[in-house]
A protein has these predicted regions:
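Mobile, glycine-rich extracellular loop/lid and propeptide segments
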Residues: 27-31, 105
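Surface-exposed loop and turn segments in beta-propeller and other repeat-based domains
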Residues: 1-2, 40-54, 93-100, 144-160
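Residue-level signal for tight coil/turn positions that link beta-strands
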Residues: 14-15, 25, 66-67, 76, ...
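Structural signal for beta-propeller blades
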Residues: 26-28, 77-79, 122-125, 134, ...
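Conserved beta-propeller blade signature
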Residues: 17-19, 68-71, 113-117, 165-166, ...
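Short loop/turn segments immediately following beta-strands, especially the blade-tip
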Residues: 31-39, 82-89, 136-146, 179-182
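Short loop/turn segments immediately following the C-termini of beta-strands
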Residues: 23-24, 33, 74-75, 84, ...
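Signature of short aromatic-glycine-proline-rich micro-motifs recurring in repeat-based ectodomains
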Residues: 1-13, 54-66, 100-109, 158-169
Length: 182
């Protein structure tokens, strides 16, 4: 549990848990407390391929507030949602698929509002940036459904005090929203 292969997004929760999307190993590594040494093995892994109808899952994005967890299954065109922090064998509460989601990558959330950066989106958000877009769910999904809105660019972002701070893929543009985008 210490050999990563093409790690994607990482998140450190306020209570010290560390989650790493270990893309080429089709899993999310979980340390239940912050590692104290380099190369320290994870406490366990969440095997994301178990929860999608595709050969690989290739998790790229991961988000958590210490309770809820979101993981992208990029190759499977799916997003996995847990309402409570999962153990190694806990299935997600929601496996979200949508014809609008292509290859989901980055995740931003405040525990209710969810933004999903997508390099190969389909549907209404295809525009000046080609297929790069960010899907928006204005409330935590409780079932598989299409996004509520979209932003015509793939953003890596953060939410603070109900404001969005984002950088477009490639780093050429910054986005600031004084309110959550709907």
């Amino acid at each position: 549990l210490n050999n990563m292969n093409f790690p994607g997004q990482v998140v450190v929760t306020s209570d010290g848990k560390v989650l790493v999307a270990d893309s080429d190993n089709n899993r999310v590594l979980v340390w239940t407390s912050f590692p104290t040494s380099s190369g320290q093995a994870a406490d366990y892994a969440i095997p994301t391929t178990n929860y999608v109808n595709f050969g690989d899952s290739w998790p790229w994005g991961v988000w958590s507030d210490g309770t809820k967890v979101i993981v992208t299954a990029t190759v499977a065109k799916a997003v996995l949602f847990w309402n409570s922090f999962p153990g190694p064998n806990d299935a997600p509460d929601v496996v979200l698929t949508s014809s609008q989601v292509g290859t989901p990558r980055s995740i931003t959330s405040d525990g209710n509002y969810v933004m999903l950066g997508d390099e190969n989106a389909n549907g209404p958000c295809i525009g000046q940036n080609g297929t790069r877009s960010t899907h928006v769910w204005t409330s935590w999904p409780t079932s598989s459904r299409d996004p509520d809105a979209c932003i015509d660019n793939w953003l890596a972002s953060a939410i603070h005090d109900s404001k969005i701070y984002g950088i477009a893929a490639g780093g050429e543009t910054m986005y600031f929203y004084d309110n959550l985008y709907t």
